[in-house]
Amino acid sequence: KAVAQQVSHLEAVALLGLVASLNRGVDAVGNPFKHGGTAYVRGAALDPLKLKGEAQFQRLCRKLEAGVDFLQTQPVYHRPQVEAMGEVLQRACQTVGCPRPKLLIGMVPPRTAEIARHFNRSIPG
Protein backbone atom coordinates (compact mmCIF):
# COMPACT_ATOMS: atom_id res chain seq x y z
CA LYS A 1 0.00 0.00 0.00
CA ALA A 2 1.35 3.42 -0.96
CA VAL A 3 2.14 5.94 1.73
CA ALA A 4 1.90 9.67 1.09
CA GLN A 5 5.16 11.55 1.48
CA GLN A 6 6.05 15.18 1.71
CA VAL A 7 7.15 16.75 -1.56
CA SER A 8 10.50 17.50 0.10
CA HIS A 9 11.13 13.73 0.12
CA LEU A 10 11.34 13.77 -3.68
CA GLU A 11 14.51 14.85 -5.40
CA ALA A 12 14.38 16.74 -8.70
CA VAL A 13 14.47 13.82 -11.14
CA ALA A 14 11.83 11.85 -9.21
CA LEU A 15 9.63 14.95 -9.03
CA LEU A 16 9.97 15.46 -12.79
CA GLY A 17 8.88 11.85 -13.27
CA LEU A 18 5.87 12.39 -11.01
CA VAL A 19 4.82 15.48 -12.98
CA ALA A 20 5.18 13.54 -16.25
CA SER A 21 2.91 10.86 -14.79
CA LEU A 22 0.33 13.46 -13.73
CA ASN A 23 0.44 14.94 -17.24
CA ARG A 24 -0.33 11.47 -18.64
CA GLY A 25 -3.34 11.24 -16.33
CA VAL A 26 -1.91 8.80 -13.80
CA ASP A 27 -1.44 9.56 -10.10
CA ALA A 28 1.65 8.80 -8.00
CA VAL A 29 0.56 5.21 -7.28
CA GLY A 30 -0.57 4.36 -10.82
CA ASN A 31 -4.29 5.08 -10.64
CA PRO A 32 -5.76 6.81 -13.73
CA PHE A 33 -7.49 10.16 -13.35
CA LYS A 34 -11.17 10.29 -14.26
CA HIS A 35 -10.85 13.38 -16.45
CA GLY A 36 -7.49 13.09 -18.18
CA GLY A 37 -4.07 14.40 -17.30
CA THR A 38 -2.67 17.70 -16.19
CA ALA A 39 -0.70 20.14 -18.32
CA TYR A 40 2.11 21.06 -15.94
CA VAL A 41 5.33 22.47 -17.36
CA ARG A 42 8.38 20.71 -15.94
CA GLY A 43 11.29 22.83 -14.81
CA ALA A 44 14.49 22.21 -12.90
CA ALA A 45 17.39 24.17 -11.46
CA LEU A 46 20.78 24.46 -13.10
CA ASP A 47 23.81 25.90 -11.31
CA PRO A 48 26.38 27.06 -13.89
CA LEU A 49 29.13 27.03 -11.26
CA LYS A 50 28.66 23.30 -10.66
CA LEU A 51 28.74 22.04 -14.25
CA LYS A 52 32.44 21.20 -14.31
CA GLY A 53 32.28 17.70 -12.82
CA GLU A 54 31.10 14.46 -14.38
CA ALA A 55 28.61 13.83 -11.55
CA GLN A 56 26.83 17.13 -12.23
CA PHE A 57 26.87 16.46 -15.97
CA GLN A 58 25.20 13.08 -15.37
CA ARG A 59 22.63 14.73 -13.08
CA LEU A 60 21.83 17.22 -15.86
CA CYS A 61 21.44 14.30 -18.28
CA ARG A 62 18.99 12.60 -15.89
CA LYS A 63 16.92 15.81 -15.73
CA LEU A 64 16.87 15.93 -19.53
CA GLU A 65 15.90 12.25 -19.75
CA ALA A 66 13.04 12.98 -17.32
CA GLY A 67 11.67 15.43 -19.90
CA VAL A 68 12.42 18.81 -18.36
CA ASP A 69 10.81 21.64 -20.35
CA PHE A 70 12.98 24.45 -18.98
CA LEU A 71 16.01 25.00 -16.78
CA GLN A 72 16.32 27.97 -14.40
CA THR A 73 19.84 28.97 -13.44
CA GLN A 74 21.24 30.49 -10.33
CA PRO A 75 22.18 34.15 -10.85
CA VAL A 76 24.82 34.55 -13.56
CA TYR A 77 26.70 37.79 -14.23
CA HIS A 78 29.61 36.64 -16.37
CA ARG A 79 29.10 35.99 -20.09
CA PRO A 80 31.73 33.23 -20.34
CA GLN A 81 29.80 31.29 -17.66
CA VAL A 82 26.64 31.53 -19.77
CA GLU A 83 28.50 30.43 -22.89
CA ALA A 84 30.14 27.49 -21.09
CA MET A 85 26.77 26.49 -19.64
CA GLY A 86 25.24 26.55 -23.13
CA GLU A 87 28.01 24.27 -24.41
CA VAL A 88 27.52 21.80 -21.54
CA LEU A 89 23.76 21.84 -22.09
CA GLN A 90 24.22 21.20 -25.82
CA ARG A 91 26.56 18.27 -25.10
CA ALA A 92 24.10 16.84 -22.55
CA CYS A 93 21.22 17.10 -25.05
CA GLN A 94 23.31 15.30 -27.66
CA THR A 95 24.24 12.62 -25.12
CA VAL A 96 20.62 12.04 -24.14
CA GLY A 97 19.18 12.60 -27.61
CA CYS A 98 16.63 15.19 -26.60
CA PRO A 99 15.70 18.68 -27.78
CA ARG A 100 17.33 21.53 -25.92
CA PRO A 101 15.00 22.88 -23.21
CA LYS A 102 14.37 26.57 -22.66
CA LEU A 103 17.01 28.19 -20.47
CA LEU A 104 16.01 30.93 -18.02
CA ILE A 105 19.09 32.81 -16.85
CA GLY A 106 18.74 33.92 -13.25
CA MET A 107 19.64 37.48 -12.33
CA VAL A 108 19.44 39.52 -9.16
CA PRO A 109 19.64 43.20 -10.11
CA PRO A 110 21.23 45.28 -7.37
CA ARG A 111 18.70 47.68 -5.85
CA THR A 112 21.23 50.06 -4.34
CA ALA A 113 24.78 51.23 -4.98
CA GLU A 114 25.90 49.48 -1.79
CA ILE A 115 24.49 46.17 -2.99
CA ALA A 116 26.20 46.70 -6.36
CA ARG A 117 29.53 47.25 -4.58
CA HIS A 118 28.96 44.10 -2.52
CA PHE A 119 28.22 42.10 -5.70
CA ASN A 120 31.39 43.50 -7.29
CA ARG A 121 33.49 42.41 -4.28
CA SER A 122 31.82 39.09 -3.53
CA ILE A 123 30.32 37.49 -6.64
CA PRO A 124 32.49 35.85 -9.31
CA GLY A 125 32.18 37.46 -12.73
Where are these regions (language model features)?
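Catalytic beta/alpha-barrel core
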Residues: 1, 69-79
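Short, solvent-exposed loop/turn segments at secondary-structure boundaries
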Residues: 2-7, 54
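Generic structural signal for well-ordered alpha-helices
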Residues: 12-20, 60, 79-86, 90
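Acidic-and-aromatic substrate-binding clefts and catalytic sites of carbohydrate-active enzymes
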Residues: 50-52, 77-81
